[in-house]
């Protein structure tokens, strides 16, 4: 691995070159996200040894959104193991948008992937809990253990999401009717919406990825958060479905597991070595941060990390 000074230099270059790149627009179907300043941008690296390099608005707290699916998948794996997740949710790409109903219809109403909305709600329903609040607190605790104890829900964002999540409610009932929902469907939808409504900064997001890169050990706190054997399962899902409809393009061009969120976050992982996180609100047509993709890809390429290059 390069020295941290080299990594910082590459991070600085990524920010300088792409933090003002044009194109894209904030997500406008969630009022909270529509109002975030679109000129914000940040990029950060956290290594498997806990070293940090960052540039830009790296302390700005933004919505985790779909990147939360990684954390809930991790918890479901801890609770039940890979085989149960594969059987009860699925572990294959859908080839369709992240909120697709057609993807369910085409596959017997099975969600297929924990990293699309249907699969993420199924994951939330699978988490061991005796009540709605216990389910929510366990998911929030997993986000904090992977990233930082400072990660917390935004009541404003949650309210904004809960009043616009009619499509997800419909998906939850479809899953319930097919036997792929493991608690009350509206409870699962509520908790899923909350998990997407937490705020974190770019360094904390990179720490989430670095914990997975480091075989489940948080390199900042030293806690063994996940069983080492679960981390490859998480990264495999990120490779197949993590970047929405652009997952194949990301694997082709960058060659690393990735996950995006409509809050503007991008996370990519170099197994065993580091994680790269980026943030900027304007999104492309499939919901990925325009600048975030450019910054994260630049860092990975400049440091020479691509799983498919010998």
Curated annotation (Swiss-Prot):
Q: Which InterPro entries match?
A: Beta-lactam/transpept-like (IPR012338), Glutaminase (IPR015868)
Give the GO terms filed under biological process for this record.
glutamate biosynthetic process; glutamine catabolic process
Q: For this protein, what is the EC number?
A: 3.5.1.2
Query: What SUPFAM superfamilies does the record tag this protein with?
Result: beta-lactamase/transpeptidase-like
Which positions in this protein are listed as binding substrate? 66, 117, 161, 168, 192, 244, 262
Task: Show the disulfide pairing.
Answer: none
Catalysed reactions, as listed in the record: L-glutamine + H2O = L-glutamate + NH4(+)
Could you say which protein family the record assigns here?
A: Belongs to the glutaminase family.
Oligomer status and interactors: Homotetramer.
Q: Which HAMAP family match?
A: Glutaminase
Q: What is this protein called?
A: Glutaminase
Species for this entry = Desulfovibrio desulfuricans (strain ATCC 27774 / DSM 6949 / MB)
């Amino acid at each position: 691995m390069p020295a941290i000074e080299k990594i910082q230099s590459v991070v600085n270059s990524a920010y300088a070159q792409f933090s003002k790149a044009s194109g894209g627009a904030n997500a406008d179907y969630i009022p909270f996200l529509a109002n975030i300043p679109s000129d914000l941008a940040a990029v950060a690296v956290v290594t498997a040894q806990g070293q940090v390099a960052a540039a830009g608005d790296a302390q700005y707290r933004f919505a985790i959104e779909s990147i939360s699916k990684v954390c809930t998948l991790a918890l479901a794996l801890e609770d039940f193991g890979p085989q149960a997740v594969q059987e009860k949710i699925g572990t294959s790409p859908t080839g369709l948008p992240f909120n697709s109903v057609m993807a369910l219809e085409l596959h017997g109403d099975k969600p297929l992937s924990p990293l699309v909305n249907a699969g993420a709600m199924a994951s939330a329903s699978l988490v061991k809990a005796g009540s709605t609040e216990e389910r929510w607190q366990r998911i929030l605790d997993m986000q904090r253990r992977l990233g930082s104890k400072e990660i917390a829900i935004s009541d404003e964002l949650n309210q904004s999401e809960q009043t616009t999540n009619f499509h997800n409610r419909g998906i939850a009932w479809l899953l319930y009717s097919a036997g792929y929902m493991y608690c009350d469907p509206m409870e699962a939808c509520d908790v899923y919406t909350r998990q997407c409504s937490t705020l974190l900064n770019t360094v904390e997001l990179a720490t989430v990825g670095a914990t997975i890169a480091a075989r489940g050990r948080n390199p900042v706190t030293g806690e063994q958060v996940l069983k080492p054997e679960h981390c490859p399962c998480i990264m495999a899902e990120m490779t197949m479905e993590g970047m929405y409809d652009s997952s194949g393009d990301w694997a082709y061009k960058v060659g690393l597991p990735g996950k995006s969120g409509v809050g503007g976050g991008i996370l990519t992982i170099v197994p065993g070595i580091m994680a790269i996180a980026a943030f900027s609100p304007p999104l492309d047509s499939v919901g990925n941060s325009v600048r975030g993709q450019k910054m994260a890809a630049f860092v990975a390429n400049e440091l020479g990390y691509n799983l498919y290059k010998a």
